[in-house]
């Protein structure tokens, strides 16, 4: 990295630098899962977005026997996780930590037999914080009433220096007070809509709650350091409800909280889990496929990339960050609530960086108030002669994460003998396919938008860590969401539409035919019949009676149909509808036929009216 700070990187400059700056590169995806798909191919489901939600959904769809295409705009998979390689080392520049309380991701880790490593700074030997222009550590006189709480909170006596226990005890008390009301707001934190008690807190920001506490500057600085790393966003923009949710999910305990959000990681990076899931599901994958438009019509979905490539499917899943959803054109248009949420954006937009340092690196955690460029700095790799630090800040406007001098200044406030030699970071706020870090909803957004973001719209379903119910903003939440939506789509395509989805499904499949005609609706799953004449998975059915078989323009009919060399008379239609495979051996049409002669007659009569 350069030793001198330069001008702010533009979004255009960021795109030019993707994957190649300073020798940092995305680790490759191995296996057949990386094989591309040809434009014009037809699929059962298209998944837009190759983060953990999209990869999870694609795997589940493939396990259900559905032909699945995964489209990713970047030149890598992973979304807001990114295992980057620098020399012989790898760094998780995005999502990183996991825990057994996060049941979805932990089940995947166990399923694939992946190995776990620990972050030393999560159980620090020293706890420091910056207040009133100097470094502080806890004093015994201030701490004795809380010391027992820190020692006993997880049922065991930690083997840590007394001064560290003092610092952790102060933090435990502050965190407990800050999150008062979490149990009432989220009695079942993995099912937030079980109760509406959380609505009483939804208009409150993190800043509002801090102001209510009326803390001393010293105590507020310690608490703000912790919250700054959690929010990765300005406190005035961050919903207090999000921090209550994290606390409730962590069992309302500071030790479990720290373990869940910053201690345990995949030894070989998040890419190791992503690879395992891809090789298990083996969907078709197309990288560099930025989607411009998603069209629905006549029971099919057409996805068009910015390069003009077009793919068709019976359904689609948009597994995208909330902040970028509005940048894709949808026809029919999205629910206004989804568009408004995307344009408002969630608050997460801060900084995560690694700093390689020279000098003796202890296991430590350092905290600073929101006004400082970095909220939290802690040990990733300790060593006598050097190591690696991880740091978080609430805004990229306060620090250039790629500037060695800027990071050096922040680190030396706590440990003046350390020399920063290199920084490694990724500008998530500049990446047009993320436009921010993990999801931290703004005040009021959970009430206004969360339920709407999760609702399907016709044949398009929505997934992502930003709309998870439990660990929203975590890898676990992305996997939760991808699993749920994949199984909804499988149920829909199998004809088992859940009651909550029925209205949306009916609206999507509404055609210019008699309402409630069940036989025709079987056809409408694959065949459009609107006046545009555009095709879906199957050819458009408007004007079929009396037309030469396999003659509709711009549709790739199978040789089985082209060889019939006849017209669609009522007799031909009846024979084909009774048993397509028998009438046209080798047809690609995956439909068993209509057994009832009266149903076939009604369907043929209906088709004759579509002119």
Question: Which residue ranges define each predicted feature?
Answer:
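Gly/Gly-Pro-rich "capping" loops immediately C-terminal to redox-active cysteine motifs
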Residues: 517, 528-570, 590-593
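A short secondary-structure junction motif
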Residues: 247-254, 544, 548-551, 580-584
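Extracytoplasmic/secreted envelope proteins and their assembly/folding machinery
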Residues: 102, 106, 207, 274, ...
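C-terminal capping alpha-helices of c-type cytochrome domains
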Residues: 567-611
